């Protein structure tokens, strides 16, 4: 769960007040994904800091990160609307990356390697949610968004997982986007493009299903969405 936290552990560099940051977090946080995807049977890796402090699913090299051009690379310097929110010095960047970004990725890599040692394979479920209306900086501006979205990797996502996902959500009565409106799924760099025993699939949930948007108040369908998410996780695990 890379984007479920609202914790900002270090305020250095921010040029906006707490009220502004709270408003931005309301928009950008993947609300309650740590609960919606919770499983006592699996290893849960949760970033304990907000994405507007450090986004663990961005590349650290801005030349490789498409969102860096909008000031929303690994360390957000602009809001979704484009306002300047933080001034990041080289020293601050190094501190945040070393103390937070790489610490998170080290935990992630250790968890994946433990699964490989125990079972010879590992399945990563990259857990997210998204607003029903595109964000200002979203690359996909199509306003007609599906209920759920899976993201895939051409090397690390087996076709059978894609097919299973499509049939599951169709049979359950939900719409599903494949690599739409968001694409890709995370893999530790040490295994990326090298080890097919490390499998990955991203699942994104449309927040309109479980929140009373634009608030972060849980809707009456929250438990329904949590249950269907749990069923999906059990299904793809059983297919391994």
PLM feature spans:
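N-terminal catalytic or cofactor-binding beta/alpha core of small enzyme domains
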Residues: 1-124, 129-240
């Amino acid at each position: 769960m890379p984007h479920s936290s609202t914790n900002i552990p270090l305020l250095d560099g921010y040029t906006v007040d707490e009220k502004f940051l709270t408003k931005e977090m309301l928009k950008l946080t993947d609300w309650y994904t740590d609960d919606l995807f919770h499983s006592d049977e699996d290893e849960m890796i949760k970033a304990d800091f907000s994405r507007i402090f450090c986004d663990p699913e961005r590349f650290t090299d801005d030349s490789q990160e498409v969102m860096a051009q909008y000031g929303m690379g690994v360390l957000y310097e602009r809001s979704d609307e484009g306002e300047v929110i933080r001034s990041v010095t080289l020293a601050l960047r190094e501190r945040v990356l070393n103390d937070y970004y790489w610490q998170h990725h080290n935990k992630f890599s250790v968890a994946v390697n433990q699964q490989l040692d125990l079972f010879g394979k590992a399945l990563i479920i990259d857990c997210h949610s998204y607003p029903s209306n595109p964000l200002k900086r979203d690359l996909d501006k199509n306003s007609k968004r599906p209920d759920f979205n899976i993201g895939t990797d051409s090397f690390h996502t087996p076709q059978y997982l894609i097919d299973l996902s499509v049939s599951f959500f169709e049979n359950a009565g939900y719409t599903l986007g494949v690599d739409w409106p968001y694409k890709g799924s995370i893999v530790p760099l040490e295994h990326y493009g090298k080890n097919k025993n490390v499998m990955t699939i991203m699942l994104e949930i449309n927040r309109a299903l479980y929140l009373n948007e634009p608030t972060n108040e849980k809707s009456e369908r929250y438990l329904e969405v949590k249950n269907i998410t749990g069923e999906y996780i059990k299904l793809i695990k059983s297919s391994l």
